Curated annotation (Swiss-Prot):
Subcellular location: Cytoplasm
Official protein name in the record: Threonylcarbamoyl-AMP synthase
Gene3D superfamilies noted in UniProt: DHBP synthase (3.90.870.10)
Broad class of enzyme this protein falls into: transferase
E.C. number(s) listed in UniProt: 2.7.7.87
The UniProt record lists the keyword Aminoacyl-tRNA synthetase: no
Domain YrdC-like: start-end pairs: 7-185
GO biological process terms, semicolon-separated: regulation of translational fidelity; tRNA threonylcarbamoyladenosine modification
PROSITE patterns reported in the protein's UniProt record: YRDC (PS51163)
PANTHER family for this protein: SUA5, THREONYLCARBAMOYL-AMP SYNTHASE
Reactions that this protein is recorded to catalyse: L-threonine + hydrogencarbonate + ATP = L-threonylcarbamoyladenylate + diphosphate + H2O
């Protein structure tokens, strides 16, 4: 079970994120790399660390949909009910992105991938730090890292590695285009 970060570590993580830093943290199936969704420096660092093309876009996780609303266009009551039928859980939805969302975050798309995670550690982390980018901690196309030690070995001092255990999921979250209902992953 994930315990809340001690106050000093929480303050350090918050300052690190605000300065454009990147965190490595446990998620449902692997460790993820994250930064603040509106921080271009952090987004560029993640893309560089992973060797990920900037046209692909990244996922943002939050503790609840209310935390993610400023990043997407308004969703009506029926749409919110659809989201809540799958959240919290391992489903990522592509929603129309707010016009202020950085292209580095959404890639070449007009949508943004968002998820309300059921992983207790992610929920606690986003409660304390706000919504975070969540992309697998790995080099693009390679195996995802499963623990903090592997993240330290791979990324060294370039990321702040937080303690935590991954969930039991063996696969990454499903990705569903909200408008069409099409399952993309």
């Amino acid at each position: 079970m994930f315990r809340a970060l001690p106050a000093a570590q929480r303050r350090a993580a918050r300052a690190h994120l605000r300065a454009g830093g990147v965190l490595a943290y446990a998620t449902e199936s692997c460790f993820g790399l994250g930064c603040l969704p509106g921080n271009a420096r952090g987004l560029r660092t993640i893309l560089r660390l992973k060797g990920r093309p900037n046209h692909k876009g990244m996922i943002v996780v939050g503790r609840r949909f209310a935390d993610l609303r400023r990043l997407v266009r308004p969703v009506d009551a029926a749409g919110q009910a659809r989201l809540m039928s799958r959240w919290p859980g391992p489903t990522t939805f592509l929603l129309p992105a707010d016009r202020r969302v950085l292209p580095l975050l959404r890639g070449r798309h007009r949508t943004l991938a968002v998820r309300v995670s059921a992983h207790h550690g992610v929920a606690m982390l986003t409660r304390d730090l706000g919504p975070l980018v969540s992309t697998s901690a790995n080099f693009a196309g390679k195996v995802s890292l499963k623990n903090a030690a592997a993240c330290r070995r791979t990324f060294g001092q370039e990321v702040m590695v937080l303690p935590g255990r991954t969930g039991r999921a063996r696969r990454p979250s499903a990705i569903i285009d909200f408008a069409s209902g099409r399952v993309l992953r």
